[in-house]
């Protein structure tokens, strides 16, 4: 999976579609990949990441919650730490799934 990711990024596409990119990676490699995504996003590359992981989503600038094929809610990181943003994402995920 790491090789496939590297091959997709080498051409510096305008947009990267990452569907559950950390699903088959261990924690260290997941964090390395997510940090890489943050870095290349700061360089102007757009990344559209599909994930069910609050931790993975916490590396994004903006998170969209999709329900029944429509945008249900969105959050902006706006200077929050990854840890604080992950907590906010988790709370919103719980609400979306009918929790609290």
Question: What are these regions, as identified by a protein language model?
Answer:
Residues 16-19:
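Catalytic Walker B motif of ABC-type/P-loop ATPase nucleotide-binding domains
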Residues 45-50:
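Conserved H-loop
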Residues 27-29:
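Helix N-cap at the start of a conserved alpha-helix in ABC-type nucleotide-binding domains
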Residues 70-94:
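Conserved beta-strand-loop-alpha-helix hinge in the C-terminal portion
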Residues 33-34:
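Conserved hydrophobic alpha-helix in the ABC-type ATPase nucleotide-binding domain
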Residues 11, 43:
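Conserved signature/switch motifs of ABC ATPase nucleotide-binding domains
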Residues 59-65:
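Conserved catalytic segment of ABC-fold P-loop ATPases
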């Amino acid at each position: 999976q790491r090789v496939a990711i590297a091959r997709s990024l080498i051409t510096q596409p305008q947009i990267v579609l990452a569907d559950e990119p950390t699903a088959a990676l261990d924690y260290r490699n997941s964090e390395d990949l997510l940090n890489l995504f943050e870095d290349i996003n700061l360089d102007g590359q757009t990344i559209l990441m599909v994930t069910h992981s609050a931790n993975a989503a916490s590396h994004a600038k903006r998170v969209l919650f999709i329900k029944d094929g429509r945008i249900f809610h969105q959050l902006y990181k706006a200077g929050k730490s990854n840890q604080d943003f992950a907590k906010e994402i988790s709370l919103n995920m719980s609400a979306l799934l009918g929790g609290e």
